[in-house]
């Protein structure tokens, strides 16, 4: 191997080759030339072959947006962090793996969480909040409706101002409220204040363990 001023790199020279470029049989060194060209190419491009690929930046659109990795942020000051996160809307934030936030100032901060609606928030794993100011704070919690709140594990609040604040509780209807575990309140302004209690109907209230109140204005105390 010798340095070639013409090629600007090292070249391979056959032991059979002479200075005039011919071997003892009078044939030109075509093979030597091919090897030289190959060596030059490897020297010039070898570093590129082993250079680590840069991970593509996230997709972002709008003033002040931020998206890294495989995330997407669309809207003024929208932020998407994690992996597979989507933030869509002004000042919207999706900050955990596979989280989705859609709407003005909506925020999804739990893994696989979904927050849709103005000022909505889903802050725990698999939590879902849909509706303006809806809040789902518990694991697997679901809040559906304007200002609905589901704050405990496996809790569900469906309806405007519905509140479910205990594990496994369900509140369905406008202004319904459930405060103890495994309880159910269904109907406008229905309330369930005891554990494992059931309230069904308008303005129904159940109080105490396993209390059941059914029908308009019913009140059950166990």
What positions do the PLM features span?
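Cleavable N-terminal targeting peptides that direct proteins into the secretory/outer-membrane pathway or into
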Residues: 1-57
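Periodic small-residue-enriched repeat registers in elongated scaffold domains
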Residues: 54-222
């Amino acid at each position: 191997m010798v340095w070639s001023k013409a090629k600007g790199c090292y070249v391979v020279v056959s032991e059979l080759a002479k200075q005039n470029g011919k071997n003892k049989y009078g044939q030109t060194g075509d093979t030597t030339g091919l090897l030289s060209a190959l060596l030059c190419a490897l020297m010039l491009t070898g570093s590129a072959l082993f250079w680590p690929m840069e991970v593509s930046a996230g997709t972002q659109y709008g003033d002040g947006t931020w998206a890294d990795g495989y995330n997407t942020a669309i809207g003024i000051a929208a932020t998407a962090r994690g992996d597979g996160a989507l933030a869509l809307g002004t000042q919207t934030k999706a900050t955990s793996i596979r989280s989705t936030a859609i709407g003005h100032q909506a925020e999804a901060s739990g893994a696989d969480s979904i927050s849709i609606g103005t000022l909505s928030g889903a802050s725990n794993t698999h939590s879902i909040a849909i509706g303006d100011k809806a809040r789902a704070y518990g694991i697997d919690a679901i809040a559906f409706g304007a200002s609905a709140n589901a704050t405990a594990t496996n809790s569900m609040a469906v309806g405007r101002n519905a509140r479910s604040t205990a594990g496994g509780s369900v509140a369905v209807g406008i202004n319904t409220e459930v405060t103890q575990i495994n309880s159910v309140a269904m109907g406008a302004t229905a309330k369930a204040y005891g554990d494992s209690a059931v309230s069904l109907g308008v303005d129904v209230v159940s109080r105490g363990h396993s209390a059941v109140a059914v029908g308009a204005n019913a009140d059950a105390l166990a």
